[in-house]
UniProtKB/Swiss-Prot annotation:
The keyword Lipid metabolism applies. SMART domains: G3P_acyltransf. It catalyses: an acyl phosphate + sn-glycerol 3-phosphate = a 1-acyl-sn-glycero-3-phosphate + phosphate. Catalyzes the transfer of an acyl group from acyl-phosphate (acyl-PO(4)) to glycerol-3-phosphate (G3P) to form lysophosphatidic acid (LPA). This enzyme utilizes acyl-phosphate as fatty acyl donor, but not acyl-CoA or acyl-ACP. It is an enzyme of class 2 (transferase). This is Glycerol-3-phosphate acyltransferase. The chain crosses the membrane at residues 3-23, 78-98, 115-135, 155-177. It comes from Burkholderia lata (strain ATCC 17760 / DSM 23089 / LMG 22485 / NCIMB 9086 / R18194 / 383). InterPro entries: G3P_acylTferase_PlsY. Pathway: Lipid metabolism; phospholipid metabolism. One of its GO terms (biological process) is phospholipid biosynthetic process. GO terms for molecular function: acyl-phosphate glycerol-3-phosphate acyltransferase activity.
């Protein structure tokens, strides 16, 4: 019962879509209506509003971090922490508050990993930053980071059957699966680079008072 309750609370925390909330509060178009139609920081950046993108990134990462941190702080067993990690991540992917139309989970996963262990989170985030800096593809950076996250986990903590390690692996698999469309675009050379502004985003910003 304790695990179920903790997972439910974590899922509800994860269901808060900061991309939609921040965009609405700042008078911007709904990120689900332009660009990749993904409610995440990268797509919000396509609106041209960097502040909104940063707030989205921080908010999505924070909810992943706070859910796992609270589980640890309350002294829940590792199996409960593992379910909390997965639940907050699933909440972001399929938010009950937004008709289950969520993001791809990169920032939320980063927050979860930082709470699991700061070195694990920082190593994974650094991997994302390096790939993003050199190739300018957010999706490629996310995919590479997702592949390396379980590797970093094994390197740091060994190959024991800790349930949190399985949660990290599950999140990595889900994150790659959520990027399957991006993989096709990358292979076809049609993927948008970081900083690209979609025409739809510009139109959406104009409709909302030119705040893009």
């Amino acid at each position: 019962m304790q695990i179920l309750l903790a997972a439910l609370v974590a899922y509800l925390i994860g269901s808060v879509s900061f991309a939609v909330v921040v965009s609405g509060a700042m008078g911007l178009a709904d990120p689900r209506s332009y660009g990749s139609k993904n409610p995440g920081a990268t797509n919000v950046l396509r609106s041209g509003n960097k502040k909104a993108a940063i707030l989205t990134l921080v908010g999505d990462a924070f909810k992943g971090w706070i859910a796992v941190w609270l589980a640890r702080h309350l002294g829940l067993p590792d199996v409960a922490v593992a379910w909390v990690a997965i639940a907050v991540f699933l909440g972001h992917l399929y938010p009950v508050f937004f008709r289950f139309q969520g993001g791809k989970g990169v920032a939320t996963a980063a927050g979860v990993l930082l709470a699991v262990h700061p070195v694990l989170g920082l190593a994974t985030a650094l991997t994302w930053l390096i790939v993003a800096f050199f190739f300018r593809y957010s999706s490629l950076a996310a995919l590479v980071a997702a592949v390396f996250a379980p590797v970093f986990d094994v390197f740091l903590f060994g190959t024991g059957h800790n349930p949190v390690a399985w949660a990290v692996l599950a999140m990595s698999v889900l994150l790659v699966w959520r990027h399957r469309g991006n993989i096709s675009k990358l292979l076809a050379g049609q993927e948008s680079r970081i900083g690209d502004k979609k025409k739809a985003a510009a139109d959406g910003g104009a409709q909302d008072g030119g705040k893009a």
